[in-house]
Amino acid sequence: MSSLTDSQVNDLHCSIYRYVQWVSQNNGSSDLLNKLQSVLDIDELQLSLDDGDQMLLPKKWGSIIRLQRAITKLEQKCDALQQELDDKTKQLETIVPKDTQIATTTDVNWLPPDHIYASIQNESPVTAIKLHPSLAIVYVGTDTGRLIAYDILNYTIPLAVTTAHSKAITSIEVIEAHNFEEFIDSTTLVSTTSKDAQINVYDHSSNTGELKLIRSFNAHDSTVSSQKTWQKDNDVLLASSSRDATVKVWRVNDSRCLQSFSPHSEWVKSIDVLDEYILSGSLDSTLRLTHWPSGNGLSVGTGHEFPIERVLIIPFSDSKICTSPYRDQNEHSAFAPLRFKYCASAARDNTIKIWEVPLPQLKPNSAPVPSTTNTTFKCVMTLRGHTSWVKDLKLRGDHLFSCSDDETIKCWDLNTGNCVKTWSSIHNNFINCIDIDREATIEQFSPSLQREILVSGDMDNKVKIIR
């Protein structure tokens, strides 16, 4: 009774009295009622003031019984549904054994929807963005030099934040390195480049969730604008390009510079790497292909009217552009040692160009050298549609994604050169960077990785996620 108020106690006592009075009304049990009135300490005034229903308690008991019956029926229905689910699971296992890898339902030529899944506000313009290759994490670099990791599914609080550089971050690369140094199995290495001329490499620990700086080196004499990381055996390699007009290749394990060369006369804005080949684009408006272990320049592409902002190698594994019916299949097979035949470039002339790379001379046990007959890229497509600088390119299957200072993201069909979709209401300012899973990444992690995500960052301090 201690949990009831005085008013509730009085109401309960009166209800009990009224109920007993109703039960014994034909039995002449006035003595019982008098005793009950005395035990419950009910006076005549309380009874006269209480005009409650004598059937209140029976009604409540009836309600409880009906509620219990409903609960019992729901429990029986849940048991039946669980049994049905178990039976269906057993039937599926008889068709597809547990150890069979079911093909991913991810569509490599997926087109992101028009609506935004999430918008993440940052404290300064977003200058670089990168998806984790297998986890639902996006890494964001800002104009103030901060590196931030967000959980795509729960982005309200960052997973990790660090002040990586004293100036703006220009690029982010993420690699799951295996047998790297002191890490026994694998670890996530996050590398950043910056206008402060440094390259930093972080271990994003799955145990602590922190971004731990493990390598830092003064890479160039000026802004480091672009980078690519990859693993060869137990070595993690990193190629970087700079405003000092050089491209360098580093071994992250010991921070040693393995190669340095100057493919351009001006700022090397962007690079892409596939095995031993580096594609570079510059403020001199040209592209160049270099065999980086030897430093041999192999070919050059000219055709843009203004500086190049981004270059991209199109590997055979990532797109069917090289096996389209109108392509020369015999000639295509000759490019097998390179593993690519086409590349893309985006420039300040508002265009994107698709290039066919000339085949260099390939000799056994020798470094490739330029062809004696052709050292010039052939422009096979010019993609027009943006109305301002094209800032970034990403490839997924036969689709090429681009972003621009015109505040739009576009998707292009590499087989036809047509723009298949434009996102014009995602951002309200210059779009600096985008990222999306490439086909090779999807195949590598299939079937565990089944995601269709596009991320982008702009000058309005926002990261947008479309999925």
From Swiss-Prot:
Sorted keywords for this record are: Cell cycle, Cell division, Coiled coil, Cytoplasm, Cytoskeleton, Microtubule, Mitosis, Repeat, Transport, WD repeat
GO molecular-function terms, A-Z: dynein complex binding; identical protein binding; microtubule plus-end binding
Question: What does UniProt give as GO cellular component?
Answer: cytoplasmic microtubule; microtubule associated complex; nucleus; spindle pole
Q: Record keywords: Cell division included?
A: yes
Entry similarity comment: Belongs to the WD repeat LIS1/nudF family.
Q: Where are the transmembrane segments?
A: none
Protein name per the record: Nuclear distribution protein PAC1
Spans of repeat WD:
121-160, 164-212, 219-262, 264-302, 325-365, 385-424, 426-466
PROSITE patterns for this protein: WD_REPEATS_1, WD_REPEATS_2, WD_REPEATS_REGION
Q: What is its main location?
A: cytoplasm
Q: Which cysteines are joined by disulfide bonds?
A: none
Where, subcellularly, is it found? Cytoplasm, Cytoskeleton; Cytoplasm, Cytoskeleton, Spindle pole
